[in-house]
Amino acid sequence: MDIIICKDEQEVGKAAAALIAPFATKGGTLGLATGSSPLSTYQELIRMYEAGEVSFKNCKAFLLDEYVGLTRDDENSYFKTIRKEFTDHIDIVDEEVYSPDGANPDPYEAAAEYEAKIAAESVDVQILGIGGNGHIAFNEPSSSLSGLTKVQALHPKTVEDNARFFNTIEEVPTHALTQGLGTLSRAQNIVLVATGEGKADAIRGTVEGPLTAMCPGSILQMHNNATIIVDEAAASKLENADHYRLMEQLKLR
């Protein structure tokens, strides 16, 4: 696990984009996350694309999750969100951006189909954010560390947190389709980004805590090619922060 500590959110985005861009140039398969954490990364990748520094035209992409009951074109779907925040602004083919089928009347069938589709590909680099409690995608604390794509009932706090994106809390879906931690772990490379003091406990648990289902992010300790990129605030509770800074300085380029 490599730990990169940056000055601020903008620098986090630049560092993450620098790792991801080579995979895009090679026409790789990308794993995309939504949420606030990867926004600066997407903004930097868009800038690089507009500057002619990277192309996504031969890439495929898989989203982490989707709400049960929402179509891809619903304004609150994660597929619609990733289009607005990222894929509409680059040259990736829209048909090569995949998400779980939230509109399938049988969500368990949708989960199995999405798991099979991901298994048939090799995700070259997976972009991740992390929740304040260490959750990855919709894998909340106590989720199986080897779990596959599944139907996940949303914690009431998650429903409450996501209500800001809907007109009323009653409109927030109560279930989601999400890649499991075992699914995510098959990615060849993982880049997790986190910013802000609110993520400091989760980053400490992910990097320095025990491997435990109570901190889903800790599964990255077992991955051969995981990079954690954080700003100073998110790194504020890391006991070995100075060591990580030194190791990054000494890394052979």
From Swiss-Prot:
Its EC number is 3.5.99.6. Disulfide bonds: none annotated. The active site is at 65 (proton acceptor), 133 (for ring-opening step), 135 (proton acceptor), 140 (for ring-opening step). It comes from the Bacteria. Pathway: Amino-sugar metabolism; N-acetylneuraminate degradation; D-fructose 6-phosphate from N-acetylneuraminate: step 5/5. One of its GO terms (cellular component) is cytoplasm. GO terms for molecular function: glucosamine-6-phosphate deaminase activity; identical protein binding. GO terms for biological process: carbohydrate metabolic process; glucosamine catabolic process; N-acetylglucosamine catabolic process; N-acetylneuraminate catabolic process. CDD domains: GlcN6P_deaminase. It catalyses: alpha-D-glucosamine 6-phosphate + H2O = beta-D-fructose 6-phosphate + NH4(+). Keywords: Carbohydrate metabolism, Hydrolase. InterPro entries: Glc/Gal-6P_isomerase, Glucosamine6P_isomerase, NagB/RpiA_transferase-like. Belongs to the glucosamine/galactosamine-6-phosphate isomerase family. NagB subfamily. Catalyzes the reversible isomerization-deamination of glucosamine 6-phosphate (GlcN6P) to form fructose 6-phosphate (Fru6P) and ammonium ion. This is Glucosamine-6-phosphate deaminase. It comes from Corynebacterium glutamicum (strain ATCC 13032 / DSM 20300 / JCM 1318 / BCRC 11384 / CCUG 27702 / LMG 3730 / NBRC 12168 / NCIMB 10025 / NRRL B-2784 / 534).
